[in-house]
């Protein structure tokens, strides 16, 4: 299994959550503050089977298309392995 931990700006969190749940991913959201994107961020947690990783990442790519080098960072994604017990 895999887990995505995504740190997104508050104004983007609802759109990303809605898109993920529309693709049948389950998402937990946590309001957070910290070093990556500073204030006004939401942490999204999403766990799924290994074969769905590409689909999940495609959702994020669709929500955050690549912009110019000077654009503001809107999302940080971490992909972790999850041990089943």
Role assignments for model-derived ranges:
Residues 1-85:
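Positively charged, small/polar-rich N-terminal and surface patches that mediate targeting and assembly
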């Amino acid at each position: 299994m895999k887990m995505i931990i995504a740190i997104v700006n508050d104004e983007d969190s609802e759109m990303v959550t809605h898109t993920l749940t529309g693709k049948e991913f389950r998402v937990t959201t946590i309001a957070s503050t910290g070093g990556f994107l500073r204030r006004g961020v939401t942490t999204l947690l999403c766990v799924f089977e290994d074969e769905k990783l590409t689909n999940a990442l495609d959702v994020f790519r669709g929500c955050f298309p690549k912009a110019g080098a000077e654009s503001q960072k809107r999302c940080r994604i971490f992909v972790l392995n999850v041990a089943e017990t």
